[in-house]
Amino acid sequence: MNAPVKILNPVGLLAELTHRCPLACPYCSNPLELDSRAAELDTAAWIKVFTEAAELGVLHAHLSGGEPAARRDLVEIVAHCASVGLYTNLITSGIGLTQERIKALADAGLDHVQLSIQDAEAKSADHIAGYEGAFARKQSVAAWVTAAGLPLTVNAVIHRANAERAGQMVKLAVALGARRVEIAHTQYYGWGIVNRAALMPTKAQADAAIAEVEALREVYAGVIVIDHVIPDYHARHPKACMGGWAKRTLNVTPTGKVLPCHAAETIPGLEFWNVRDHSLRDVWFASPAFNAFRGTEWMKEPCRSCPRKEIDFGGCRCQAFALTGDANAADPVCHLSPDHDKVAAIAAHANEEEAATEIAYVYRGVKAPVPAE
């Protein structure tokens, strides 16, 4: 038997304030069954969550959704996070933000903004987002963010429809005044797995996009930081998902369920505790879902005897379940997995000529109107 797993305090909290969103991105990682507005935590409950997070040692509060700007109490939430010493990062589509609201958020103590873009070309970007005018609106929001003195990161998800413009998206981020850009190839969870056939690029597309972005590191050294999340379907080893299950971060859903990762609900049989019934401290240290895949005792072969088991932790549990039906199995991305042929077949299909044509998206459900000020 291995020694008991040492559980350190978390450093990050992803707060999904709402699932409401005016966009309908086909790669959205939100669950297929979206939480309703009526079921969301109220302001007082979220304030309690952030207070407990700070007491637990959390340093960073990532305010996400859906679209967090759909919450009328967003400024109040940011002000409270600042008052308890949390660094706040707003992850937003920009839709629902005005120049006045951004200034109010900055005055309340907001530390950072991450703004998503869907492409470097307006027509394609709006098509991907399922929202006409989104591209133009995001450029205005970026200008308002930098005018308010807030540091800006631009996020771009790469897939078949925009892979040829990965480098242009880096250049767009520079033009928008961002200090950092995250170029992330699609991770297939939530709506992303529904749309995998439409989203997955060919290997040639992925390789070209990766090379283009990597070449820009030297071009823009000292100008912008480039974070690059490459696709794992063409890799030999799996990603160290979340840095290991329930090791660094936790996620609170709009209704108060606390998850080890945003896709954990896709694994059946896990018991998720809710902030309405338990403190964050109790959830982090004692909840069954958080302890399900901590350490290495749960691992099967080939992970159990693998020298990389403390490096990639067997890969992603959610992906393992999605592709094998067994959350304890090795992530099939790994070339040592007995199920690796499933990943290879999916990647090979993306390379076939008939699969490389445009496939209609199944857009993310439940589009909410932009909230009134």
Curated annotation (Swiss-Prot):
GO terms in the biological process aspect are: pyrroloquinoline quinone biosynthetic process
Protein name (database record): PqqA peptide cyclase
Q: Quaternary arrangement and interactors, per the entry?
A: Interacts with PqqD. The interaction is necessary for activity of PqqE.
Its gene name is pqqE
Instruction: From the UniProt record, list the coiled-coil ranges.
Output: none
Q: Domain (Radical SAM core): give its ranges.
A: 7-227
Xref: HAMAP family: PqqE
The GO terms describing molecular function are: 4 iron, 4 sulfur cluster binding; cyclase activity; iron ion binding; oxidoreductase activity; S-adenosyl-L-methionine binding
Q: Which Pfam families match?
A: Radical_SAM, SPASM
Which keywords fit this entry according to its UniProt record?
4Fe-4S, Iron, Iron-sulfur, Metal-binding, Oxidoreductase, PQQ biosynthesis, S-adenosyl-L-methionine
Instruction: State the CDD domains in the record.
Output: Radical_SAM, SPASM_PqqE
Q: What is its EC number?
A: 1.21.98.4
| PROSITE patterns in the record | RADICAL_SAM
Q: Which reaction does it catalyse?
A: [PQQ precursor protein] + S-adenosyl-L-methionine = E-Y cross-linked-[PQQ precursor protein] + 5'-deoxyadenosine + L-methionine + H(+)
Co-factor remark = Binds 1 [4Fe-4S] cluster. The cluster is coordinated with 3 cysteines and an exchangeable S-adenosyl-L-methionine.
